[in-house]
Regions:
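Basic/aromatic recognition patch in beta-strand/loop cores that engages polyanionic ligands
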Residues: 48-78
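Basic, Lys/Arg-enriched alpha-helical interface segments
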Residues: 2-54
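Enriched for short, Lys/Arg-rich terminal
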Residues: 68, 73-98
């Protein structure tokens, strides 16, 4: 499978990195980053293992990594990672343009 990371998901990742690094330090960020990488690898290996959410548009799947939820969709042989959001965020608001 091919994967494409949206600009929004990339920005989410940068924001997670900045927040975690500033609040908890480099070691915690490195641990969290490893877990996020493992989460992405799991999606690539098992693209239909995610779950649906009522607050995310139809056709999208969610996969939880610690406090964050990776939102993605699968089309043909491509996985589109569209957002990486904190589990306490308002997902409906984040997807109002989709």
């Amino acid at each position: 499978m091919t994967s494409i990371v949206s600009e929004e998901a990339y920005e989410d990742l940068v924001n997670i990195q900045n927040y975690t690094y500033s609040k908890y330090g480099e070691n915690q960020w490195q641990e969290y980053g490893i877990d996020l990488d493992k989460g992405i690898a799991h999606i690539l290996e098992h693209p239909f293992s995610g779950h649906t959410r009522k607050d995310v548009p139809n056709g999208y799947q969610a996969s939880t990594v610690r406090e964050h939820v990776m939102i993605y969709r699968v089309e043909d042989k491509t996985i589109y990672l569209v957002r990486i959001l904190h589990g306490k965020m308002n997902f409906t608001f984040q997807f109002s343009g989709y």
